[in-house]
Amino acid sequence: MRNRAFLFGLFFIEYACLVLFAAPTRASLLKSNVESTLAEQWDSNGTRTLQADDSKRISAEERSMEQALLPGAEAMGKTKVPEKAVPRASLGSKLNPLNWPKRIWYKLRLWYARVRLYILKQKTTGENAIGIAAMEGLTPLSLKKLKNEIFHYSSSEPHDKWLIEKDYNSFVKHYFSQFYGLYQNPPVSEIDKWNILVEEMLPLERIAVRMAMDRVGRIVDKGYSIEKLISLDVSPLLYLRLMDSKGVFENVKENKDAIEHLRDYVEAYHKNVMM
């Protein structure tokens, strides 16, 4: 019995010693923690490197991440969400009472231009109607001005814009076709057909032609430049008829300068119309 107790005591003492020496001490724990902070790494050249995985490195990484994300976060914060448009009577709105006088004025000007265009269409319908209107002083520039007024005072593109452009181009082509003889050698006026047309006019129409001719004669006799004549919208066709009535084409050599001036004026007038 004593032997058994003695053996059991030795066994217990031996077991306690084994457990005591196998347990890690505080110093060994601290040492292992320090060693664990040094992680072995290998770079691309095969060189063994040690990287400290401590709190300082973690703090540096956090700061770098914060600096990288901060500009994006600030940009998101500065981005303005588009506000929903609120309908209001702005300065350019039709509901603004300040714009009503201007709109009424535009409507009146458009109506007046439309009436004038309608009268011209009625007046220039027929075989000799365009010639009569031209003898009374109708010019491509006056028709161009009327066309531009309709386009300008219309709130949107006119529904008959293509028709207005077509009639205008047709008139311009017919008008300047009367000057082909002016550039021949020797130049001819070909004005006889217009004189016959005037003789067949009604008395009131002949009065209108005479008044238009007198106006052109007064302006031309003042010796204005070509630019000034264009600004006054002197009819090239009436200018041609005026030169013919003065006998310029009967003696071309003596009136060469007057003919050249008329040619230059017709060319400049045509360029101005086509601008």
Curated annotation (Swiss-Prot):
Domain of life: Eukaryota
Sequence similarity: Belongs to the RxLR effector family.
Gene name in the database record: RXLR153
Sequence motif: RxLR-dEER, positions: 48-63
Endoplasmic reticulum found in the keyword field: no
Protein's recorded name: Secreted RxLR effector protein 153
Glycosylation sites per record: N45
Subcellular location: Secreted; Host cell membrane
Protein role: Secreted effector that completely suppresses the host cell death induced by cell death-inducing proteins.
Cellular component, GO, one term: extracellular region
Record note on domains: The RxLR-dEER motif acts to carry the protein into the host cell cytoplasm through binding to cell surface phosphatidylinositol-3-phosphate.
Signal peptide residue numbers: 1-27
Main location: secreted
Keywords, sorted A to Z: Glycoprotein, Host cell membrane, Host membrane, Membrane, Secreted, Signal, Virulence
